[in-house]
UniProtKB/Swiss-Prot annotation:
Belongs to the glycosyl hydrolase 1 family. GO terms for molecular function: 6-phospho-beta-galactosidase activity; beta-glucosidase activity. D-galactose 6-phosphate binds at residues 19, 116, 159-160, 297, 428-429, 435, 437. This is 6-phospho-beta-galactosidase. It catalyses: a 6-phospho-beta-D-galactoside + H2O = D-galactose 6-phosphate + an alcohol. Induction: By lactose. The operon consists of lacABCDFEGX. Keywords: Glycosidase, Hydrolase, Plasmid. Its EC number is 3.2.1.85. One of its GO terms (cellular component) is cytosol. Pfam families: Glyco_hydro_1 (PF00232). HAMAP family: LacG (MF_01574). The lineage of its organism: Bacteria, Bacillati, Bacillota, Bacilli, Lactobacillales. This gene was sequenced from pMG820, a laboratory-derived deletion of the naturally occurring plasmid pLP712.
Length: 468
């Protein structure tokens, strides 16, 4: 049976400042940790990315033409405050006013994120969110933006608190490149959730007219053998690291006994302890019912198997299928079932995981209000032929995920929109320019845009709300 989506549904496209803007040192922008980290460790930089800093009128015109009525944008903190605090860079402020005005002119609603992986270098090198002083700097930055940009109706505090801690302190593929430090992972999650909660409370206390929420990446975790209690336990512990810890903070205002039991077990196995303060929980509790929406970023699921051994993680950054490895001491290891397809980057394609994750939020956190799928899409090495890309695989991937999203709505979940990652091709943090996701192909040499087959498909979807 053909499935549909609601008439008032947002059909969006997602971007991020550092992945799209380029212009990394233009008009007074301050450095971020990624600038030097990419130069030192990878074969690419964020210059020029998609040159969104100059090309945004083109991208927004394409968005309007192809039925995209919402766009995820992030503000580069170091464009506003080059060192993270102190003196305001007026040219940066002016850029975002012009960008938001163009969005409204094109009838593309901007959903604006304050922090998308790009803490200013001066604060990042000073401990990033492990340093509680930087919580205060983030709140000051948020307060400035809320007041300065009343034209923004939808605010997101953070993009993917989970993968920030994971990338910085577990896998080590994000600056500062620390590996296997689970205590830092949880402390980063916690301090960022406190920052989120305080920003949300500030926004509501000031009486601003818009909506505010947070975007979490929520990869669903399954036991490899659901009949094996040890595999079930491995999936539960992995879920705590990536999902439950931050969801509890968002909607319970504390960590459940089961969550803390898992955290304490993981830290007992791996070392370290957490600094959790009474005032932190007061902040979390004060904001738990104030989130207007939850953004869910979903790309993949994982299957977990019990494992007795040392931690080892190998990140597949070059699309060499089968080269990744993930096992954590005291938690488990990822072992994908043979029947589940995966991408060249070993990302498992499992649309049912999106349905299960949406329903998990609905059932476990009934104060959630509403959900947007804020990122979902398929990255691969697009073949540019005849000024387009015949990306049937991407269309099929998105279609399958929209179908289970439609099922979730039918089963009572309040899902109000979907943002494909990404609107146009952007650079990928740990994969560079080879891995493309966009509806529009970007020639990174000329910065020309070309609609892919998926762009035409998405336009028809947005016009009809029919998934076919």
């Amino acid at each position: 049976m053909t499935k549909t989506l609601p008439k008032d549904f947002i059909f969006g496209g997602a971007t991020a400042a550092y992945q799209a803007e380029g212009a990394t040192h233009t008009d007074g922008k301050g450095p971020v940790a990624w600038d030097k980290y990419l130069e030192d460790n990878y074969w690419y930089t964020a210059e020029p990315a998609s040159d969104f800093y100059h090309k945004y009128p083109v991208d927004l015109e394409l968005a309007e033409e192809y039925g995209v009525n919402g766009i995820r944008i992030s503000i580069a903190w170091s464009r506003i405050f080059p060192t993270g605090y102190g003196e305001v860079n007026e040219k940066g402020v002016e850029f975002y006013h012009k960008l938001f005005a163009e969005c409204h002119k094109r009838h593309v609603e901007p959903f604006v994120t304050l922090h998308h992986f790009d803490t200013p270098e001066a604060l990042h090198s000073n401990g990033d969110f492990l340093n509680r002083e930087n919580i205060e700097h983030f709140i000051d930055y948020a307060a400035f933006c809320f007041e300065e940009f009343p034209e923004v109706n939808y605010w997101t505090t953070f993009n993917e608190i989970g993968p920030i801690g994971d990338g910085q302190y577990l896998v080590g593929k994000f600056p500062p490149g620390i590996k296997y430090d689970l205590a830092k992972v949880f402390q980063s999650h916690h301090n960022m959730m406190v920052s989120h909660a305080r920003a949300v409370k500030l926004y509501k206390d000031k009486g601003y007219k818009g909506e505010i929420g947070v975007v979490h990446a929520l990869p669903t975790k399954y036991p490899y053998d659901p009949e094996n209690p040890a595999d079930v336990r491995a999936a539960e512990l992995e879920d705590i690291i990536h999902n439950k810890f931050i969801l509890d903070a968002t909607y319970l205002g504390h960590y459940s006994d089961k969550t803390m039991e898992g955290v304490n077990h993981i830290l007992a196995e791996n070392g370290g302890e957490l600094d959790l303060r009474d005032e932190d929980f007061q902040a979390l509790d004060a904001a738990k019912d104030l989130n207007d929406f939850l953004g869910i970023n979903y790309y993949m699921s994982d299957w977990m198997q019990a494992f007795d051994g040392e931690t080892e993680i190998i990140h597949n950054g070059k699309g060499e299928k089968g080269s990744s490895k993930y096992q954590i001491k005291g938690v488990g290891r990822r072992v994908a079932p043979d029947y589940v397809p995966r991408t060249d980057w070993d990302w498992i394609i499992y649309p049912e995981g999106l349905y299960d994750q949406i329903m998990r939020v609905k059932n476990d956190y009934p104060n959630y209000k509403k959900i947007y799928i804020t990122e979902n899409g398929l990255g691969y090495k697009d073949e540019f032929v005849d000024n387009t890309v015949y990306d049937d695989g991407r269309i099929d991937y998105v279609k399958q995920h929209l179908e289970v999203l439609s099922d979730a709505i039918a089963d009572g979940a309040n899902v109000k929109g979907y943002f494909i990652w990404s609107l146009m091709d952007v650079f990928s943090w740990s994969n560079g320019y080879e891995k493309r996701y966009g509806l529009f192909y970007v020639d990174f040499d000329t910065q020309e845009r070309y609609p892919k087959k998926s762009a035409h498909w998405y336009k028809k979807l947005a016009e009809t709300q029919v998934i076919e």
